[in-house]
């Protein structure tokens, strides 16, 4: 039986409220909150598209995201995949070309004092997303259908489920930071302990190594079925998974 703490739903509710506000600002050439459907290899594919801007030479597909500064600073392939599926749906169902994709990111933890290289310049940011070819989109959708079919078969036959990739789990590797005693920022951040020890020797006295454990952010904070997942349980127990 699945359980979810209601406090975990705060940002989802906030995101829904933001969508409602933005919907009221639509123009005549805007299509807001439209769900499109198509069938591929016997599977039903659908997507609720936040905004379509219809222009003479094509459609711009946009999606609103209430997200973190970290997510904006680090490319999320999930966003690219999602919007390209939307583009495929638009071109398949409407037979009109898609000319562009973008994310409108509402950054909930934006702070002026955190400004640094690559940090979002404002709490609202538009991010252009790469538009794949129609063939690339079709191949990706068929690949995902195949993965879902394999997982469904594994469940029905009581077999092990396919494991998620590091990208799918939003995995952050373990890091070793070389810091000065009493300092706040790291002088060096290393991917191996060996490299960190070398940097520590060069740094001289009054420096130390801070171990920063790795994390699978999506599993830890967003997956509602992690308690039933063998891969997560192995990882959480310190085993390789």
State each model region's role.
Residues 17-21, 85, 139-144:
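Long, highly charged amphipathic alpha-helices
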Residues 1-59, 68-70, 74-81, 114-118, ...:
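Metal-dependent nuclease catalytic cores that hydrolyze phosphodiester bonds in DNA/RNA
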Residues 64-65:
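Activation of the activation-loop gatekeeper triad in protein kinase-fold domains
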Residues 10, 42, 69, 85-87, ...:
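Residues in intrinsically disordered, low-complexity segments of regulatory proteins
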Residues 79-90:
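Membrane-associated lipid acylation/remodeling enzymes share a hydrophobic transmembrane-juxtamembrane segment
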Residues 89-241:
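Metal-dependent nuclease catalytic regions and adjoining charged, substrate-binding loops involved
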């Amino acid at each position: 039986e699945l359980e979810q703490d209601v406090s975990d739903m705060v940002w989802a509710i906030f995101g829904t409220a933001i969508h409602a506000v933005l919907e009221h600002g639509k123009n005549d050439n805007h299509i807001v909150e439209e769900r499109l459907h198509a069938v591929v290899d016997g599977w039903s594919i659908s997507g609720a598209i936040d905004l379509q801007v219809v222009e003479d030479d094509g459609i711009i597909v946009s999606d609103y995201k209430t997200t973190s500064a970290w997510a904006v600073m680090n490319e999320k392939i999930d966003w690219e995949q999602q919007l390209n599926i939307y583009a495929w749906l638009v071109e398949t169902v409407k037979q009109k070309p898609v000319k562009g994709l973008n994310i409108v990111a509402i950054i909930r933890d934006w702070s002026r004092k955190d400004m640094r290289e690559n940090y979002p310049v404002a709490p609202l940011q538009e991010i252009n997303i790469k538009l794949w070819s129609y063939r690339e989109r079709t191949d990706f959708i068929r690949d995902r259908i195949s993965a879902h079919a394999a997982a469904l078969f594994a469940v029905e036959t009581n077999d092990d489920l396919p494991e998620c990739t590091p990208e799918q789990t939003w995995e952050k590797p373990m890091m070793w930071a070389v810091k000065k005693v009493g300092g706040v920022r790291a002088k060096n951040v290393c991917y191996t302990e060996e490299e960190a020890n070398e940097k520590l020797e060069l740094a001289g006295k009054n420096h130390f190594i801070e171990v920063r454990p790795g994390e699978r952010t999506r599993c830890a904070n967003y997956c509602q079925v992690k308690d039933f997942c063998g891969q997560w349980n192995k990882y959480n127990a310190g085993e390789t998974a």
